[in-house]
From Swiss-Prot:
GO CC annotations on file: endoplasmic reticulum; membrane
Membrane topology note: Multi-pass membrane protein
UniProt subcellular location: Membrane
Name of the featured protein: Uncharacterized membrane protein At4g09580
InterPro entries reported in the protein's UniProt record: TM41A/B (IPR045014), VTT_dom (IPR032816)
Keyword set, alphabetical order: Membrane, Phosphoprotein, Transmembrane, Transmembrane helix
Phosphoserine modification, residue list: S37
Source organism (scientific name): Arabidopsis thaliana
Transmembrane domains' residue ranges: 55-75, 124-144, 147-167, 218-238, 260-280
Length: 287
């Protein structure tokens, strides 16, 4: 009779241990499912953050841009179709410059329209390669006209990306950069009274990628006029450096040559000047 009592006691103990461990196991499972780190395992519903409506809006905007770009493409002579290719290396860029040099001179207005449309399209939909477009502007149009073209197109593309993100970008940014977005939101909240200076600093220096700034700015409630001014002015130093480098494509081996230690130091110096008034104002308040 003792044996059954022992078996019953062991079974009850095992059941008690199992019951006590269940909440912990459940919490751990929930923690894995709710892990928002970029490397964390996502549930099926989290793998693609956009809803059907948001994806439909994004696709519609993309289709409108693509259709407009294709219509501009059709205005070019058929002989030039095969020469059009978005450059991915300095070698591609040199070849594109040689192929389009005469066309850009003969049909300048048409070429500029196509160039601007392509640049804005790439900026709006976060397509890599705009730095090559900036180099191409310097190579084909010189420093002054190339600089104006690049700054205006980069600003227009960033603003277009801003509004697209405001429309459907919140879940995508939260999904891609959850920690970085929380950090950025906290920094913006601390600098509301001097937001333009802070945004200028971010635009001038490579502290945060421009892609992240374009997409996250409407999500952290940065006013559009602040975003526009910071983008227009803040992109000027880097644009000038890139456009000027386009005059000497033969001397460039890779894009990395554009931003050496000296260039980055100059950009950070200019960026520091942009936040100096805010630092001075804070010092006066403390005094």
């Amino acid at each position: 009779m003792a044996a059954p009592r022992n078996l019953t006691g062991d079974g009850g103990a095992r059941q008690l241990v199992k019951d006590e461990e269940s909440p912990a196991a459940s919490s751990a499972a929930k923690g894995l499912l709710n892990d928002d780190s970029p490397t964390g395992k996502r549930t099926k519903s989290e793998r693609f953050p956009l809803s059907r409506w948001e994806f439909a809006v994004f696709f519609t905007v993309f289709l409108v841009f693509t259709t407009g770009l294709f219509c501009i493409y059709l205005t070019m002579p058929a002989a030039e179709y095969g020469k059009l290719k978005v450059p991915r290396t300095i070698s591609d860029l040199r070849l594109l410059k040689e192929n389009l040099g005469s066309y850009a001179s003969e049909y300048q207005a048409r070429f500029i329209l196509g160039y601007c449309s392509t640049y804005i399209f790439m900026q709006t939909f976060m397509i890599p390669g705009t730095i090559f477009m900036s180099l191409l502007a310097g190579a084909l149009f010189g420093v002054v006209r190339g600089f104006v073209l690049v700054v205006l197109n980069a600003t227009a593309g960033a603003c277009s990306c801003f509004f697209l993100s405001k429309l459907v970008g919140r879940p995508l940014v939260n999904w891609l950069w959850p920690e970085k977005l929380r950090f950025f939101q906290a920094e913006i909240a601390k600098r509301r009274d001097r937001l333009l200076n802070y945004m200028l600093f971010l635009r001038i220096t490579p502290t945060l990628p421009n892609l992240f700034i374009n997409l996250s700015s409407p999500i952290v409630d940065i006013p559009f006029h602040v975003f526009f001014l910071a983008t227009l002015v803040g992109l000027m130093p880097a644009s000038y450096i890139t456009v000027r480098a386009g005059l000497a494509l033969g001397d460039l081996r890779s894009v990395k040559d554009l931003y050496d230690f000296k260039t980055l130091s100059v950009l950070f110096l200019i960026g520091s000047i942009s936040i100096f008034p805010a630092l001075l104002k804070r010092k006066r308040v403390y005094e």
